[in-house]
Amino acid sequence: MKFFVDTADVKEIRELNDLGLLDGVTTNPSLILKSGRDIVEVTKEICSIVEGPVSAEVTATEYSEMMKEAAALSRIADNICIKLPLTLDGLKACKALTSDGHHTNVTLCFSANQALLAAKAGATFVSPFIGRLDDIAFDGMDLIREIRQIFDNYGYETEILAASIRTVNHVKEAALIGADVVTAPPATLKALVKHPLTDKGLEMFLADWAKTGQKIG
């Protein structure tokens, strides 16, 4: 499974990348706003930190304007992945961009039907939103399961990028079901390492080692 981080915070991206955990980055207009930086400036810096795909989202809603914005975003760096909304215009742009050799991430997916359309449009990634479905009492993992079965049935190469990940359990469940990628906030990715028995065991080992009076090296 690939791990993407969902942030435009360069400090957090550097830290996770140095740990060897990152396969890519996803951003959106809300995260750019939170960063307080110019979209081109911050996206270019992010692309210089990670080798994997960096999703940068268009804000236009009409096909022709989407294509103009996609052209501008793609000039930022070679590892830009154009993020598009799951609308008819977004799918049309996805097809055109994919045919032209660009990587694409079709976002705001909330149904298996939508995911199927994204795959048919040639999307590199489709991003089903887990947490937001949970908010309306729909099990987001059921959606991942449905998409996985459909893609496997027909051999679609579009990767399932589980988004709106809010807990470490979301990560585990997405991995068990077969999502290709999860994108999560920095805090959630860091929390994956935590377990109380790990902390307790380390504390015990260090206490016992101190009693030996020895040093290594």
From Swiss-Prot:
Instruction: Look up the record and name the pathway of this protein.
Output: Carbohydrate degradation; pentose phosphate pathway; D-glyceraldehyde 3-phosphate and beta-D-fructose 6-phosphate from D-ribose 5-phosphate and D-xylulose 5-phosphate (non-oxidative stage): step 2/3
Active site (UniProt): K83
Quick one: signal sequence residues?
none
Q: What is its EC number?
A: 2.2.1.2
Q: Which SUPFAM superfamilies match?
A: Aldolase
UniProt-listed Pfam families:
TAL_FSA
One Gene Ontology cellular component annotation held by this UniProt entry: cytoplasm
Q: Say which enzyme class the record assigns.
A: transferase
> Which processes are annotated in GO (biological process)?
carbohydrate metabolic process; pentose-phosphate shunt
Q: Name one GO molecular function term.
A: aldehyde-lyase activity
**NCBIfam families the record matches:** fsa_talC_mipB
- Family membership: Belongs to the transaldolase family. Type 3B subfamily.
**What name does UniProt use for this protein?**
Probable transaldolase
Q: Which organism is it from?
A: Sinorhizobium fredii (strain NBRC 101917 / NGR234)
